[in-house]
Amino acid sequence: MKILRLFVLLAPALVAPGVALAHGGSYSGPGTSAPGGAQVPPGTADPPASATRWETWWAANKEAFLRLNEQMREDVDPTSQAGGGAKPKPDKSAAELRRLRDEATRSALVPVFVEALSDESFEVRTAAAIALGKAGGTDGAKALREMSFKDKHKDVRDAAVLALGLLGRETDIPFLDARLRDDKDNPRHRAFAAFALGLIGGEDAAAALLAFAEGSPDKPSTFEREPAALVASTFVAMGLTGDARVLPTLRQALINPRFDDNIRAFVVLSLGRVKDRASLAEFGSLLAVERPTTKDVGLRRSAAIALGKMATAADAATVDVLCAAARNDPDENVRQFAAVSLGGIADATIKKRLEAMLGESPTAGRPFLALALAIAHDSDAAPAIRAALAKETDESTKSSYCIALGLLGDKEAAPLIEKQVEDRGRIWLQGYAALALGLLHHVESCDMLNARLMSDNDPRLRGNLAVALGLMHDPRSKNWLVATLKRADATVYERGGAAMGLGVLRLNEAVPEIVDVYRDKKEHEMVRAFAVVSLGLIADPSPVPKLSRFAIDNNYTLAIDPLNEVLTIL
């Protein structure tokens, strides 16, 4: 999608990190870097990084932990989903009032999105289709179906199909099933139909995907002869449905010699997403450091991720396999994914094992172990991470410690984290430190963060500063973003970034200003489209953006063109 491709090139000059790849591309196996750069959901700014850096994992998975939609809509002291301590109970009357305001805003925006579907700019139409899907605007379902095959631009057609999945209506399953089966259409469009079915989920969507893969008595399957990217996309979609009926087909695919290891690696991820405990032993064998049943790193990386979704702390053999992989696997990504999986299933014993690994690990391995301890809610590890931050010199590693301490809710770390902002090192360390202060709800830092927001000239840092202030419900972030949006001398990139920032902060009260920008036909096409994207973020009621399901717990070292494209959509 052109606007999203532009966003990649211009990301250093924009507030939010939404990113994209060009259309096209080929099916490829695992590599040493995330394909095409950062392919992540929107939220806070992250640097482009190799697939072995913690920033790449965080960019793909952060929505699950930040839960910005939930955090920004709280009228009380917010805490991160992964943060330590009990979350204060919101006042019921205030929460109900907020719910009503959100519903009213959403209802008012749906007609705006429907109107934007007919905009002369295909960028705006593309953004409007996705925004309509996020908002659950069923009034636009008919228009989306028509756009999916009539719009003159392929980006809009693809977005319309995916938007039908975001709407989540079972009544659209037959239409999407027909689009998936249309072998005259291009494979990416058909893959988007599969993804849409996965997003709708449930028995009927799973049945459509299974019928496509397995055939029927009157129409034998040609699935194995379909393009590899479409086959892999179908298996990804099966995992998204969450329906146990897909398990036999996925298990069979794992042993089907017609499917290569790259396809099978996606199958492993889907079995993990559906929590197929029957595959625990097999995946443990894939991951075993000594005498694994495969040498394919893509399969082993996927197994490390999947075991974290399928296992519990009581599965002693699986825990031992994950611990061995986190310590000693020759592949860096396997070690990292295994550590994160241990954090997700940790009990007191696993926490102690992770603490020991953190103490013994070389510097390169510590970011993921610190994050694993944060995911495990291991407050006992906070002093060790604090001490590591105090003496660390590598700014990337320091950044990971800041995020880990923020997720742990370790308020004792606030002065040390604040120092990372005040020392004015690289912008990424400052940005992550600011975000950590927001996660801690350290309101004592608000004046300092606001002063930096006003004085700094790097939009990437300003984006993280604005989100940090937003997490603490400080109104100055909104005021700065609105002022930037209205500034006549602001660049296209600054105005587009400000529009996106208002969406990231889910500011209902900024909707009139953002709508005005979209409707201003004299405004730059890029800014107008970002305004619609921003409105879509505000209208989305999901605690975690629906499209982030493709990125969370994904093996981002694998690449297929349709999935790469979905991962770029804002």
Predicted regions and their residues:
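Ankyrin-repeat and related helical/solenoid repeat scaffolds used for protein-protein interactions
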Residues: 485-486, 492-552
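Positively charged n-region of N-terminal signal peptides that target proteins for export
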Residues: 1-5
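Extended repeat-based scaffolds of very large eukaryotic assembly and lipid-transport proteins
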Residues: 20-138, 142-150, 154-158, 167-192, ...
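Membrane-topology and secretion signals of cell-surface/extracellular proteins
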Residues: 187-190, 228-229, 362-363, 394-395, ...
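Bacterial N-terminal signal peptides
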Residues: 7-16
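Eukaryotic tandem repeat interaction scaffolds
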Residues: 426-428, 432, 436-438, 451-503
